[in-house]
Amino acid sequence: MLPRILHPEELQGYRFSGKDHCRLAILREGDGASSTVFLEVHDPCDRVPPHSHHHAAEFFFVLRGEVIFHIDDQAICARGGDFLAVPEDARHDLENPGPERLYLLTVLSTDEGFAESLRRGIPTPLDAEDLAVLRSL
């Protein structure tokens, strides 16, 4: 694979459904067995439903904002600059409790069809606020 720079303006956001308050943009797509890297943008008060990844650990780097992760029976608060690793099979969710958007850099150690599933969702461009935040990092 040749190196490639992605500029914020080139990113395509997606929502899984029209009810979602989260946009995800794929930065590097795995082939099912390799990792996928993506940007998550969560609106205030958004909450991702509980789920698990049976063959993938998930890694989160908080770029901006505050987040509460719920992993098994534990609540963990994190903010910009913090990193969290969720082991495979761990039931987890996350919520944005803050009044501002939450930005996460996320890695799934094994794609498990995630990127393909996301691409079947609703294309939703990143807006001017998102692009300004990404440019300021």
Regions found by a protein language model. Give the residues of each.
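A short, N-terminal "cap"/entry segment at the start of jelly-roll beta-barrel domains
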Residues: 1-35, 119-137
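Conserved short histidine dyad/triad with adjacent acidic residue
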Residues: 38-53
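A short hydrophobic beta-strand segment most commonly corresponding to one strand
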Residues: 39, 85, 100-117
